[in-house]
């Protein structure tokens, strides 16, 4: 899901909730198998969003990815085949941020507690929460099983990766006048061609080994002047830690 008219990052839509599709990577490359052991697939009989494992029993995703029942699939690369080493664990608790706004996508973050702890190994491991916020120009890695086409649909079986920079607040806000809150940032390329897309929603943006972003929304995918918009995880570290401790 991408959101925002298709905003396509996570599947909802900020201005016009037009499409509840999830996002996928456009213009990226197939990730090295099991090289992103923190990446999870959220499954409801089908892949619908991504997420990030932050400890053995908790996953960070996007609030717009909420479903009442979710199975978290860890250790995945080809989501259409059981390759061996995957772990499928049902969600015990699904907690959206209390201030999430489905119209604006502000506070688009959600925590999922696994029914039982994941077994951590070379294929399934955690990503660190940010120690500080990312800065403009920082190179990051976005990943997911979302749509790979900016026009049309092609959902990949294999996890896709995209290397992309954090954009300045000014260029982000000028791309989406009046829609970027202090809890959002843009990442990608103003010239278009590379972006997250439907199906990538909820998935990770990792910069220097830290989870800085969650795929949230955008206007279409990989459109010129319309970069992807991401939830700024650094603003939620306290909420995440407090929620995990209380549940």
UniProtKB/Swiss-Prot annotation:
GO cellular component terms attached to this protein's record: extracellular space
Record field: transmembrane: none
Co-factor(s): Ca(2+)
Site positions per UniProt: Required for specificity: 195
Residues engaged in binding Ca(2+): 76, 78, 81, 86
GO molecular function (one): metal ion binding
Catalytic activity: Preferential cleavage: Arg-|-Xaa, Lys-|-Xaa
Keywords of this entry: Calcium, Digestion, Disulfide bond, Hydrolase, Metal-binding, Protease, Secreted, Serine protease, Signal, Zymogen
Pfam families: Trypsin
EC number(s) recorded for this UniProt protein: 3.4.21.4
InterPro entries from the UniProt entry: Peptidase_S1_PA (IPR009003), Peptidase_S1_PA_chymotrypsin (IPR043504), Peptidase_S1A (IPR001314), Serine_Proteases_S1 (IPR050127), Trypsin_dom (IPR001254), TRYPSIN_HIS (IPR018114), TRYPSIN_SER (IPR033116)
Domain Peptidase S1: 25-245
Disulfide bridge partners, by residue number: 31-161, 49-65, 133-234, 140-207, 172-186, 197-221
Subcellular location: Secreted, Extracellular space
A Gene Ontology BP annotation from the UniProt entry: proteolysis
UniProt cross-references to PROSITE patterns, sorted A to Z: TRYPSIN_DOM (PS50240), TRYPSIN_HIS (PS00134), TRYPSIN_SER (PS00135)
Residue positions of the active site: 64, 108, 201
Signal peptide from the UniProt entry: 1-15
Family the UniProt entry places it in: Belongs to the peptidase S1 family.
Protein name, entry field: Cationic trypsin-3
Gene name in the database record: Try3
């Amino acid at each position: 899901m991408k959101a925002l008219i298709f905003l396509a990052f996570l599947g909802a839509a900020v201005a016009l909730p037009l499409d509840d599709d999830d996002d996928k990577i456009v213009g990226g490359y197939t990730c090295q198998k099991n090289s992103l052991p923190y990446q999870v697939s959220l499954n409801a009989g089908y892949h619908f969003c991504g997420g990030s494992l932050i400890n053995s029993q908790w996953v960070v995703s996007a609030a717009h990815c909420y479903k009442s029942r979710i199975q978290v699939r860890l250790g995945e690369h080809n989501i259409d085949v059981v390759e061996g080493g995957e772990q499928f664990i049902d969600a015990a608790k699904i907690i959206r941020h209390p201030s999430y706004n489905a119209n604006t996508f502000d506070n688009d973050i959600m925590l999922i507690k696994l029914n039982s702890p994941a077994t951590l190994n070379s294929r399934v491991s955690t990503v660190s929460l940010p120690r500080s916020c990312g800065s403009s120009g920082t190179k990051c890695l976005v990943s997911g099983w979302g749509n790979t086409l900016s026009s049309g649909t092609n959902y990949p079986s294999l996890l896709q990766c995209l290397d992309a920079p954090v954009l300045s607040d000014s260029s982000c806000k000028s791309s989406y006048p009046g829609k970027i809150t202090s809890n959002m940032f843009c990442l990608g390329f103003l010239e278009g061609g590379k972006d997250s897309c439907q199906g990538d929603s909820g998935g990770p943006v990792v910069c220097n080994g830290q989870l800085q972003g969650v795929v949230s929304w955008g206007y279409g995918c990989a459109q010129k002047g319309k970069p992807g918009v991401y939830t700024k995880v650094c603003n939620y570290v306290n909420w995440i830690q407090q929620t995990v401790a209380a549940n």
